Amino acid sequence: MTSTPAEAKITVMAVHAHPDDETLWTGLALAKARRLGHDVAVVTCTLGEEGEVIGEKYQALVDAQQYEQGTGMLGGYRIAELQRALGALGVQHGPNFLGGCGTWRDSGMEGSESIRHPRAFAREVEPAQDLLDAQVEQLIQQIQSIRPEVILTYAADGGYGHPDHKQAHRIVHEAVQRLSGASAEGAGADVFVPSQVLWCVTEDEKFAKGMQGLEDDPTAVPEGWTLPAAGEIATVPSAEVDLVIHGSAEDVAAKQAAMRAHATQIWVADGTASDVNAQVRESNPPAPSATTLFCLSNLITQPLLDSESYRLGWTAPGVPEDFFARALAEQMV
């Protein structure tokens, strides 16, 4: 018995700020869509140059401002990680970088020196509209080339406030509005307009269930890792979630493999080591909804869930709100 999509084939495109975001935020949706025969693509806006590096071996990849022996080669290294992650998720197109590889740079966090870099994706510049216009036109070109019915990106707050995440949200919605307006005005029969935009979010109840039992069993937390303090992981109330995508064991395994591919950024406690990080951590999370545990460079424990949560960001006129849900519905044959 095999699963097939209940609806016609579509193209799903995720627009993300940095390499690894496509996996952490939307990896399950992309893997499931591909398994069901849909086309999937990812547009990455920067190379993630400001990321911290897990493990000792490749600390010198970061900039000299972060590490005395820093070489500033992290962005290039993360291209290779992104390639492997996309392969694990089944993404056929890419890597695709907004405006081309290296056009835009990781801005870092609010108030950092890096956000004033001339190529910073969310650069603090006047007039800000000029920067936005350039990025929107580049994204429109990608949309017209890839022709996605569904676009996945962040909510207006970027998920946790990162300037690049918020900028990705802005350009997605501005691009869709411009395309929708051009189509309505009859600017050209060849103008492709997506059907739906969804925002990836971390749902509070799902996250809490994935962490269930860890406080009562300290041995379940990998050595050297910590549990998140209250509010340390940004979540949204379950009442605000419009779509929950449940992944099969195959989908979750694909996301987990993609997470391992981003070894400089993600540490998966699944008993495996890598060239980047020789240290091994194992986990046996008590919660049934958590496949394994992982952390970023901050060593804060998080669960790899068997689902992802989304909010509706925009739906084209005449398109049902459950458009993407229908596309991911499975029928057994």
Curated annotation (Swiss-Prot):
Alphabetized UniProt keyword annotations: Hydrolase, Metal-binding, Zinc
GO molecular function: N-acetylglucosaminylinositol deacetylase activity; zinc ion binding
Reaction(s) catalysed (UniProt annotation): 1D-myo-inositol 2-acetamido-2-deoxy-alpha-D-glucopyranoside + H2O = 1D-myo-inositol 2-amino-2-deoxy-alpha-D-glucopyranoside + acetate
InterPro entries: GlcNAc_PI_deacetylase-related, LmbE-like_dom_sf, Mycothiol_biosynthesis_MshB
Pfam families given in the database record: PIG-L
Coiled coil: none
Domain of life of the organism encoding this protein: Bacteria
GO biological process: mycothiol biosynthetic process
E.C. number: 3.5.1.103
UniProt KW tRNA-binding keyword: no
Cofactor details (free text): Binds 1 zinc ion per subunit.
Reported cofactor(s): Zn(2+)
Binding residues annotated for Zn(2+), in chain numbering: 18, 21, 165
HAMAP family per UniProt: MshB (MF_01696)
Function: Catalyzes the deacetylation of 1D-myo-inositol 2-acetamido-2-deoxy-alpha-D-glucopyranoside (GlcNAc-Ins) in the mycothiol biosynthesis pathway.
Family designation: Belongs to the MshB deacetylase family.
Name of the molecule in the record: 1D-myo-inositol 2-acetamido-2-deoxy-alpha-D-glucopyranoside deacetylase
